[in-house]
Amino acid sequence: MTDAPQHPQQPATGTPATPKAAPRVGRDVRIGATCGLLVALMVGAAYAAVPFYNWFCRATGFNGTTQVAKVAPSAAPLARTVAVRFDSNISGGLPWKFEPEQTEINVRIGEVATVYYTVTNHAATATTGQAAYNVTPLTVGSYFTKINCFCFTEQTLAPGEKREMAVVFYVDPSFAADSENDGVRTITLSYTFFPVKDAAPKPVAASEPDRPGGSI
């Protein structure tokens, strides 16, 4: 019996078979999950950086951030004096007038001083502002200490209200021991009021109490 003639194998024609998609889909899912995790970590780090930055500035006086204390220093004031100038600014969108009652005073290092700012709301409605602050030279930030300040809280003013606000502060005696401050003769305390757009409804705060007698 004669075998059937063998024909040469013809090359395959048409579109090759599509490989299975499951492995690629799984890889895409893993990549997407990894990217999502990285984004979440970056967002979380950004939010965590804000309170850390604020704490760092308060702890070190970085960028002219002042310190906060509840009581006056226990040591007696030094003989050395320094001039403290007072600056005031209003951010756009806040219809207030804001200015210091004194533009400059001289204080002894370690002496507690009280100064006053006045603010007037020119709007026809109650408005709320929050004051940001710093001191220059920036090296002074870790020594300039506030005991009381209107900048600690938001300020809500009734239409047309004028308010007197106090700042109680001292320059820490350790300021004089820092060689970086040997040439510092003047410190500038600067405030800028910014509008608070989403302030919670609350009664308009009472005016500052009458100032105590005596000079600064």
Swiss-Prot record:
User: Which keywords fit this entry according to its UniProt record?
Assistant: Cell inner membrane, Cell membrane, Copper, Membrane, Signal-anchor, Transmembrane, Transmembrane helix
SUPFAM superfamilies listed in its UniProt record: Ctag/Cox11 (SSF110111)
Q: What does this protein do?
A: Exerts its effect at some terminal stage of cytochrome c oxidase synthesis, probably by being involved in the insertion of the copper B into subunit I.
Please tell me whether the keyword Endoplasmic reticulum is annotated for this protein: no
Q: Which GO terms describe its cellular component?
A: plasma membrane
Q: How does it sit in the membrane?
A: Single-pass type II membrane protein
| Periplasmic face of the membrane | 50-216
Enumerate the GO terms in the molecular function aspect: copper ion binding
NCBIfam families reported for this sequence: PRK05089.1
> Which parts of the chain are coiled coil?
none
**What name is this protein filed under?**
Cytochrome c oxidase assembly protein CtaG
Family as reported in the entry's similarity comment: Belongs to the COX11/CtaG family.
Q: Which Pfam families match?
A: CtaG_Cox11
Q: Which GO terms describe its biological process?
A: respiratory chain complex IV assembly
Ranges where the record places region Disordered = 1-24
Task: List all membrane-crossing ranges.
Answer: 27-49
Q: Which residues lie on this side of the membrane: Cytoplasmic?
A: 1-26
Where the protein is mainly located, per its record?
membrane
Kindly list the places in or outside the cell where this protein is found, as annotated in its UniProt entry: Cell inner membrane
**Low complexity bias: start-end ranges:** 1-23
